[in-house]
Amino acid sequence: MDKETNDNEYRRQSEHRTSAPKRKKKKKIRKLPIILLIVVILLIALVVYIVHSYNSGVEYAKKHAKDVKVHQFNGPVKNDGKISILVLGADKAQGGQSRTDSIMVVQYDFINKKMKMMSVMRDIYADIPGYGKHKINSAYALGGPKLLRKTLDKNLGINPEYYAVVDFTGFEKMIDELMPEGVPINVEKDMSKNIGVSLKKGNHRLNGKELLGYARFRHDPEGDFGRVRRQQQVMQTLKKEMVNFRTVVKLPKVAGILRGYVNTNIPDSGIFQTGLSFGIRGEKDVKSLTVPIKNSYEDVNTNTDGSALQINKNTNKQAIKDFLDED
């Protein structure tokens, strides 16, 4: 009887050992639909949030901004994993004439998650197709972003796919919405002349209007070169400030606001894709280049445009190519 009892006990233990993994597998299988359901619910909630936030931004822009007419641009689509954008800071001079206060070309590499920024000095003396020689920023007033793109291509070999014209009000609104606590900037000197605000030397958190004034200041020995340097500093700081959850979750609403204050031919999908990739996964440091590069230009006085920068085109074209192609 003892032997029979031992045999029965052995069989029960064997059955328990073999059935335990099966029960665990069944539990895992039962949990799988629940997990999938939770994922689906979260995705639906995310889509609803994005749509609601975007529409909220659009409604905000409708109340505070004017209708924006998209320009013809016809930039070449390259399909190389990179997006290049001609970014223009626009103001209206007396009489309503639109002018560019800053000219930048921004390239984002989706594969390597890197951003590069190139500032083009607005006083470059350039060949403007159909208009002869003038300062390069005159191209925008004469023919909008499209003519400026053609001018950049002819003189510097730059031919971006998209454009974005940011008016000053739009810049202020976007900064205040994204970063209500202000943007940390080390103001290197007291600034006030022709910028609409008074800034004191030292470390400060600047709101949208103050940050715009800082980026526009040019009344010091550096002149326009100093302004370009500060604009690049602002872009670097904004990139670093964007890499946090509180800012990223606001991107859909900001994209909606963009539609009211930024004149651009970038589709909504492109704004979302670039913004999320840049804000979440992109490198914190943005590589920058100022055109013309050092020792490649001279100051000249022109009959039509006054003081301007006469550049060595070949030297600058090669520097631009090396900068954009560098990994």
Curated annotation (Swiss-Prot):
One of its GO terms (cellular component) is plasma membrane. The chain crosses the membrane at residues 32-52. It holds the Pfam family LytR_cpsA_psr. Keywords: Cell membrane, Membrane, Signal-anchor, Transcription, Transcription regulation, Transmembrane, Transmembrane helix. Residues 1-31 are cytoplasmic. Residues 1-24 are annotated as: Disordered. Disulfide bonds: none annotated. It comes from the Bacteria. Residues 1-18 have a biased composition (Basic and acidic residues). Residues 53-327 are extracellular. Gene3D superfamilies: LCP protein. It is a single-pass type II membrane protein. PANTHER family: POLYISOPRENYL-TEICHOIC ACID--PEPTIDOGLYCAN TEICHOIC ACID TRANSFERASE TAGU, REGULATORY PROTEIN MSRR. Belongs to the LytR/CpsA/Psr (LCP) family. Involved in SarA attenuation. Affects resistance to oxacillin and teicoplanin, as well as the synthesis of virulence factors. This is Regulatory protein MsrR. It comes from Staphylococcus aureus (strain Mu50 / ATCC 700699). The lineage of its organism: Bacteria, Bacillati, Bacillota, Bacilli, Bacillales. The gene is msrR.
